[in-house]
Amino acid sequence: MAAKDVKFSGDARERMLRGVDILANAVKVTLGPKGRNVVIEKSFGAPRITKDGVTVAKEIELEDKFENMGAQMVREVASKTNDLAGDGTTTATVLAQAIVREGAKAVAAGMNPMDLKRGIDIAVAAVIKDIEKRAKPVASSSEVAQVGTISANGDAAIGKMIAQAMQKVGNEGVITVEENKSLDTEVDIVEGMKFDRGYLSPYFVTNAEKMTAELEDAYILLHEKKLSGLQAMLPVLEAVVQSGKPLVIIAEDVEGEALATLVVNRLRGGLKVAAVKAPGFGDRRKAMLEDLAILTGGQLISEELGIKLENVTVKMLGRAKKVVIDKENTTIVNGAGKKPDIEARVGQIKAQIEETTSDYDREKLQERLAKLAGGVAVIRVGGATEIEVKEKKDRVEDALNATRAAVQEGIVPGGGVALLRAKKAVGRLTNANDDVQAGINIVLKALEAPIRQISENAGVEGSIVVGKILENKSETFGFDAQNEDYVDMVEKGIIDPAKVVRTALQDASSVAGLLVTTEAMVAEAPKKDAPPAMPAGGGMGGF
């Protein structure tokens, strides 16, 4: 086992604090509308330019192992906030640095670290209660756009685009962000249920120009197994022909004689039909077929459920206003499923999302949820160069996460005002134990850190801004760093999601509390290089 290097108390905290400061100072320059960019070297290709706090934090690795431990713990703050709220990573880092700094001073002055941590926790709980009380629900699409704009560093076009996408696909809908090949940033919205399986034969095409099969007011047969022959299906096929409506068959596969018969019928004009493979694999395929059955108001034909193909009637088939199938995708628009059934299924999938521990499963469940509940929107980010596209994509993703968080827990005044106003709630707290009270006071001071940093990044003295805001009685009065003006933050549209502010403070105080209570640090001792070998002796050349 390699030898270890151990540092204690003051020495350990000093090294750790140095690491915290290096990482936090690199991250905090990005805070606010006038935050600066950070350029990150890449081992290949052009460097990356970003204003995303967590991206900067993830790139920092320090040479000194003890300093690096401090930096990595603050990096964890940014990562955790990003995972939970998707934004607010820089605010969380600034708060963590402020709490650790003040905490380290208090410990150096001889206070009990455990009591300090208790005080920090009491104060944070009071702030969170205050934020929850102040949060107001997002009422309109324009408020969604404002949240997006603030998170995208004042880019109103991005805010507007996210609001448009959310309006179309609903709050449960899936919005993905991709890179665009052109200069423009655009939104592409898919209404209805879309899955990545196309027609099994090009002979099913009805629109030769677009190479798509478009079937209006269609019946949908959902079959769990492969279809090799159509003998068992004849009764239901005849009933569909008599109704004069088209039929879409979705099964594990349609092959051989079955596919040939369907193609011949389609070409002769006897039956408007198209066949598609079922989406997904294994258990997921079955679940997606059940989703389709609920969405279209039909039944999944499965022998497990005791339904045989020969017993299928037209009533068991699903219905949809329109089905569009191209070479690679199928879209079902306006399925005839009953709303209560769809809502029950959505509730079931939400419960599964909460229970699952696998990120992959969660992602797939969220996709299913979106397809059932709303739709899918894709924001394609464009730009003149690859570097610009990547930087813009970071901002779009931040803005998207912030708007989702706002819809969940409501909004509070932005620009660090919500935390600053929470000082009143913390100021009321008193504790007989002086060290616990000192912990409460640490949070009281740290609540000013984000607004000070936003002001300083805009070239304005932070303490003057804090003083001026606290003098004003209005709860929503704050500093608009973009225009260097004092305004009503909510009226001006400078708002933050309550969830982002709450998560940033919780994560920052959690890690900062651990750093403050650290008394020893253990790292691998640096290896001493072995002395170089003796050079070979001079020979007796030739003898």
From Swiss-Prot:
Q: Which organism is it from?
A: Bradyrhizobium diazoefficiens (strain JCM 10833 / BCRC 13528 / IAM 13628 / NBRC 14792 / USDA 110)
UniProt keywords (A-Z) are: ATP-binding, Chaperone, Cytoplasm, Isomerase, Nucleotide-binding
| Any GO CC annotation of this UniProt entry | GroEL-GroES complex
Family, per the entry? Belongs to the chaperonin (HSP60) family.
Q: Which NCBIfam families match?
A: GroEL, PRK00013.1, PRK12849.1, PRK12850.1, PRK12851.1
One BP term from GO: protein refolding
Q: Which residues bind ATP?
A: T30, L31, G32, P33, K51, D87, G88, T89, T90, T91, G415, D496
InterPro entries linked to this entry: Chaperonin_Cpn60_CS, Cpn60/GroEL, Cpn60/GroEL/TCP-1, GroEL-like_apical_dom_sf, GROEL-like_equatorial_sf, TCP-1-like_intermed_sf
Q: Which HAMAP family match?
A: CH60
Q: Which cellular compartments is it found in?
A: Cytoplasm
Q: Name one GO molecular function term.
A: unfolded protein binding
Complex and partners: Forms a cylinder of 14 subunits composed of two heptameric rings stacked back-to-back. Interacts with the co-chaperonin GroES.
The molecule here is called Chaperonin GroEL 7
Q: Which SUPFAM superfamilies match?
A: GroEL apical domain-like (SSF52029), GroEL equatorial domain-like (SSF48592), GroEL-intermediate domain like (SSF54849)
What the protein does? Together with its co-chaperonin GroES, plays an essential role in assisting protein folding. The GroEL-GroES system forms a nano-cage that allows encapsulation of the non-native substrate proteins and provides a physical environment optimized to promote and accelerate protein folding.
Q: Does the keyword Chaperone apply?
A: yes
Catalytic activity line of the entry:
ATP + H2O + a folded polypeptide = ADP + phosphate + an unfolded polypeptide
EC numbers: 5.6.1.7
Q: Which gene encodes it?
A: groEL7
Which CDD domains does the record associate with it? GroEL (cd03344)
Nucleotide-binding as a keyword of this entry, yes or no, is: yes
The record, for PROSITE patterns, names: CHAPERONINS_CPN60
Q: Where exactly are the transmembrane stretches of this chain?
A: none
